[in-house]
Amino acid sequence: MFGSSNPFGQSSGTSPFGSQSLFGQTSNTSSNNPFAPATPFGTSAPFAAQSGSSIFGSTSTGVFGAPQTSSPFASTPTFGASSSPAFGNSTPAFGASPASSPFGGSSGFGQKPLGFSTPQSNPFGNSTQQSQPAFGNTSFGSSTPFGATNTPAFGAPSTPSFGATSTPSFGASSTPAFGATNTPAFGASNSPSFGATNTPAFGASPTPAFGSTGTTFGNTGFGSGGAFGASNTPAFGASGTPAFGASGTPAFGASSTPAFGASSTPAFGASSTPAFGGSSTPSFGASNTSSFSFGSSPAFGQSTSAFGSSAFGSTPSPFGGAQASTPTFGGSGFGQSTFGGQQGGSRAVPYAPTVEADTGTGTQPAGKLESISAMPAYKEKNYEELRWEDYQRGDKGGPLPAGQSPGNAGFGISPSQPNPFSPSPAFGQTSANPTNPFSSSTSTNPFAPQTPTIASSSFGTATSNFGSSPFGVTSSSNLFGSGSSTTTSVFGSSSAFGTTTPSPLFGSSSTPGFGSSSSIFGSAPGQGATPAFGNSQPSTLFNSTPSTGQTGSAFGQTGSAFGQFGQSSAPAFGQNSIFNKPSTGFGNMFSSSSTLTTSSSSPFGQTMPAGVTPFQSAQPGQASNGFGFNNFGQNQAANTTGNAGGLGIFGQGNFGQSPAPLNSVVLQPVAVTNPFGTLPAMPQISINQGGNSPSIQYGISSMPVVDKPAPVRISSLLTSRHLLHRRVRLPARKYRPGENGPKVPFFTDDEESSSTPKADALFIPRENPRALVIRPVQQWSSRDKSILPKEQRPTAPLHDNGKSPDMATDAANHDRNGNGELGATGERIHTSVNANQKPNGTTRSDQASEKERPYKTLSGHRAGEAAIVYEHGADIEALMPKLRQSDYFTEPRIQELAAKERADPGYCRRVRDFVVGRHGYGSIKFMGETDVRRLDLESLVQFNTREVIVYMDESKKPAVGQGLNKPAEVTLLNIKCIDKKTGKQFTEGERVEKYKMMLKKKAEAQGAEFVSFDPVKGEWKFRVEHFSSYKLGDEDEEDGV
């Protein structure tokens, strides 16, 4: 072979590796073997043969493990053979027949597989076909090469070399190779090779093999009459009584009788399911009888018993088959399918953003869909279906019961996760969404997180439990050496408690070990990593330094797991204590430093602002782990008293809730950052300034609702006074039509007026906050139809000079209404004329002006009550003109009039150049001083298109010079010179001059004086001496133009 004159697999006299035959072929003596001593490696019997012969090749034509007379490696017993029994045998080789075996039979490793009594002499091949060579008929490529029919080499016909002459080599034409028809090589039909029969190779049906039935690569060699694990005489330890878990016929993944270590009588933890793609009988380690298992009988991670397989709800699968029917360790066992059936709702799988496919470009990461319906576990349901499932389960929000995790799975595992011991097939092949405790791929598995790389075996996965690797193991912690990915596991996984970042539980990152690695005892989270319990400070369980290079000892570091009892970021034994003096490492346990510049840590890990005790809240975003963690990664706001705003143990936010802001005692659970995470058990008590009412979240679509703040009490000096007397309403009056007197309206204008405060009301202080506020009598002048008897007239108190203020008739008389009943105010007026006269007895006339009457007195109150009302401060609004329509305006504005009236009483009697207008129509400026008190401008002034009317009712028009019937300057808008045929506006030229002349004539015709005309703006100004109606009609334009 290597170095010999013969081709690969041909017979020769000498072999560089110690025998004339190749792997399992005829050999003369061990002297031809340069690597073999006089005594073989253990015995003269081959590797698990019946008699003393070669282990990897013998004198006769024995298969891999067939009886030989001499061994290329030794002459005496093989590994664990006769004279000195090895590995539990008496005389036989590794798995030979005569003596008993500790694995249950007389064979060693698979002879009588795991407790079965059928004797078999050859564990890795029968003794019946011992005349056949190992990898081929006589030599590796002699009579029946790898894939050929009778004699060729690796797919060649007669006696070719490695794939040589007459008949095609590896899958060639006449004797086809790889899956060909007539006499194919490598898995063909007639004399199939590499797992081929008349039915297909890989997983074929009737008599499959790892090659085929009667030809190459394990045809009669390598331990059977068939190929590698073929039909009649099974391959690689397969026989009538199976070898290393093998059985009668099937090939590598074949159908009827399993290949490569499969059997009907199971071996090393096999089951009844087939091999890799096989149908009925399982493969590598598949059986029906229990062996190495934690449950009843399945294989290592099999259907009915293996650790977490069917005991916790898994389905049958071969050594690596990922059956995704029932969850694994924690999938069903801890709250899902097997114990209690399928559990639905929004808590079945912890919420995590779904990465949107085909969105990441270059350096930009892929986008994420922030929707629970986008998750693979919920993609068939919408929000309301999940909500309905929550209600069916009785889940209406709030935290889970004690000891129950957010997901249905045991430690955060998705409920649809399969085999516990292998998420992917046994030989590194991947499977669909396998979440396996000991070899997980892409799911959140408690004992091994992420997808193993190719060649990662079942027992070894990416990273491990506490941190990214199992107790200091590096990230490629495959048990059998295969590489794997480097994501975290259940106690640091990204989905155990609703967290979304792949960071471990106690703050460790994805690097392993006790120092430079991520484990339970060690390092801090990497950048962007948020641990499962949400400590956002880079603090670890046992005071390891953060990954950003922060240093600190066990008692002086910022934010370690158990606390730094109140330490600040200062050194360990010198930070400020509660009394502003240095303390030891455990100082400040119940109160932190009162300085304003440093932040300290609470006794249980939370970093706090200065002056906040450790049982108070931390700064926003400074959550920590240990006993003070903000449980699920939510930020905490600062408080001033009480605990951290939550109901946690020592101040942590309860299940991801951040406390309310400062200084008001309200019940307020705040928003959960994870909308589908755990919800608060009850509203949190916090101190807050603005009164925010609680917002309770239930279900999926609950969002925080913050109501308006509670109204703040306003000082009485800023209270608008009109609110007080607006609440005073007169009782409804009875109407008797039979009595004399005019009919009055049911409500007067002032009672129907709006109570909206004027703009100046909040800015003008009240003159006397204790004064009794009533409406002046003048507002009800429409009811003054008869005069009260003189003995019921109210009188005013006399001043010191003996003179009483004026009591005008319309102001002093709270008279009877039309039906003779006293009004509500008039009934309380019972004063005599001389009640309050001074000794000089002088009074003034009742016809005195209202301006000189600043006070009124109302009697009938109990002694000592305030009965003096300052009329001017109380009745500013009543004096103001009324103008409710929004498109009308006055200059000065009514608010300014009120302010000036307060500052200068009587100002509204003499407003200079008062303007009333309507936006887009025009305006009127009344020349000189105008008395605007109590003017109902809406009924007096009306603007229409190119028209203004003052005093529409001629009967109500006062004499010229009084009221608004006085000289004024009128401005009308939209007076433009337009060509009516084309719609073009003329701003200059002859047509404009003609139009201007027409306006002058129109003004003169109405008794007005033309002032100006602006053809660009369309403004026409003219002056009038008195008012009626002034307009410009369309016919006037036609005449003028």
Curated annotation (Swiss-Prot):
Keywords in alphabetical order: mRNA transport, Nuclear pore complex, Nucleus, Protein transport, Repeat, Translocation, Transport
InterPro entries named in the record: Nucleoporin_S59-like (IPR037665), Nup98_auto-Pept-S59_dom (IPR007230), Nup98_auto-Pept-S59_dom_sf (IPR036903)
Primary localisation category: nucleus
Repeat as UniProt keyword: yes
Any GO CC annotation of this UniProt entry: nucleus
GO BP of this protein: mRNA export from nucleus; photoperiodism, flowering; protein transport; regulation of shade avoidance
Ranges that cross the membrane: none
Region Disordered, residue ranges: 1-44, 98-171, 315-347, 392-447, 517-560, 734-860
GO molecular function annotation: structural constituent of nuclear pore
Biased composition (Basic and acidic residues): 782-793
Sequence repeat start and end residues: 2-3, 8-9, 17-18, 23-24, 41-42, 56-57, 64-65, 79-80, 87-88, 94-95, 103-104, 109-110, 124-125, 135-136, 140-141, 146-147, 154-155, 162-163, 170-171, 178-179, 186-187, 194-195, 202-203, 210-211, 217-218, 222-223, 228-229, 236-237, 244-245, 252-253, 260-261, 268-269, 276-277, 284-285, 294-295, 300-301, 307-308, 312-313, 319-320, 329-330, 334-335, 339-340, 411-412, 427-428, 459-460, 466-467, 471-472, 480-481, 491-492, 497-498, 506-507, 514-515, 521-522, 533-534, 555-556, 562-563, 565-566, 573-574, 586-587, 604-605, 627-628, 632-633, 650-651, 655-656, 676-677
Residue stretches making up the Peptidase S59 domain: 885-1027
Polar residues compositional bias, start-end: 1-34, 117-171, 533-560, 831-846
Annotated region (65 X 2 AA repeats of F-G), positions in chain: 2-677
Low complexity bias locations: 430-447, 517-526
SUPFAM superfamilies associated with the record: C-terminal autoproteolytic domain of nucleoporin nup98 (SSF82215)
Subunit organization: Part of the nuclear pore complex (NPC). The NPC has an eight-fold symmetrical structure comprising a central transport channel and two rings, the cytoplasmic and nuclear rings, to which eight filaments are attached. The cytoplasmic filaments have loose ends, while the nuclear filaments are joined in a distal ring, forming a nuclear basket. NPCs are highly dynamic in configuration and composition, and can be devided in 3 subcomplexes, the NUP62 subcomplex, the NUP107-160 subcomplex and the NUP93 subcomplex, containing approximately 30 different nucleoporin proteins.
Family under the similarity heading: Belongs to the nucleoporin GLFG family.
Annotated domain remarks: Contains FG repeats mediating the translocation through the NPC by interacting with transport factors.
Additional free-text comment from the UniProt record: Unlike in mammals and yeast, NUP96 and NUP98 are not translated as a polyprotein.
Protein name: Nuclear pore complex protein NUP98A
